[in-house]
């Protein structure tokens, strides 16, 4: 089942989500995208992004570099950057080198895009300038952007942070939640309202993200340009 042929979304509600946000139900087992694509997996910290990517791409969470699968998919998770820097900076309080970790993560995303082929990226999505930069860079490279958003109740996300052993500061958590709600409010205007030039958008709640079995990249024609698609639907 390709993003362009997903069933019509059914109304759904999750905490903090505007009522007009709609989700695909049931969740497709396999998502297919054109080979020259960036799939941006976004959600607040603790939403389950790394958990899903580790499961789908056979990762452990201990990697310290971009993972390239046998199928040629490059998977870029911010935890890889943290793992790479930690041995060098473990004596320094993490908040002091967090900006360096983010910078390394963004540089690795750009490097993966320069190499071509499919790229899957872990990113909170709550930083507007980062979303705009990715949209601009992908347009320059001729790469399609597809959005896979994982929505989570803030309390569940906080518990997810505690479970993984990496908890963001309370103030930072509130900021992520506030920005995420603004992102969700923009979704009904179409994928391009979230990331300029994005071609598709799929919104899953935290629980249903576990139903997804595979993200597959296949040669084929590009999807039509977005034109005000509803959230959860794909043009």
PLM feature spans:
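Conserved nucleotide-binding/hydrolysis micro-motifs of P-loop NTPases
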Residues: 80-83, 126, 151-156, 208-210
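Glycine-rich phosphate-binding loop used to anchor ATP phosphates in small-molecule kinases
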Residues: 96-145
């Amino acid at each position: 089942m390709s993003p362009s042929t997903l069933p019509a979304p059914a109304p759904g509600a999750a905490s903090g989500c505007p009522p007009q946000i709609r989700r695909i139900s049931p969740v497709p087992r396999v998502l297919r995208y054109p080979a020259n694509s960036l799939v941006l997996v976004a959600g607040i910290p603790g939403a389950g992004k790394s958990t899903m990517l580790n499961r789908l791409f056979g990762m452990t969470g201990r990697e310290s570099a971009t993972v390239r699968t046998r199928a040629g998919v490059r998977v870029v998770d911010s935890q890889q950057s943290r793992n790479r820097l930690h041995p060098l900076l473990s004596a320094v309080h993490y908040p002091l080198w967090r900006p360096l970790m983010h910078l390394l993560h963004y540089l690795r995303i750009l490097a993966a895009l320069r190499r071509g082929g499919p790229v899957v990226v872990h990113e909170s999505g709550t930083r507007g300038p980062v979303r705009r930069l990715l949209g601009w860079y992908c347009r320059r490279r001729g790469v399609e952007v597809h959005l896979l958003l994982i929505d989570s109740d803030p309390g569940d996300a906080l518990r997810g942070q505690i479970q993984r052993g990496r908890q963001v500061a309370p103030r930072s958590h509130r900021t992520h939640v506030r920005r995420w709600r603004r992102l969700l409010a923009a979704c009904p205007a179409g994928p391009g309202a979230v990331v300029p030039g994005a071609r598709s958008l799929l919104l899953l709640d935290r629980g249903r993200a576990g139903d997804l079995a595979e993200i597959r990249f296949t040669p084929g024609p590009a999807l039509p340009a977005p034109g005000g698609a509803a959230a959860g639907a794909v043009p």
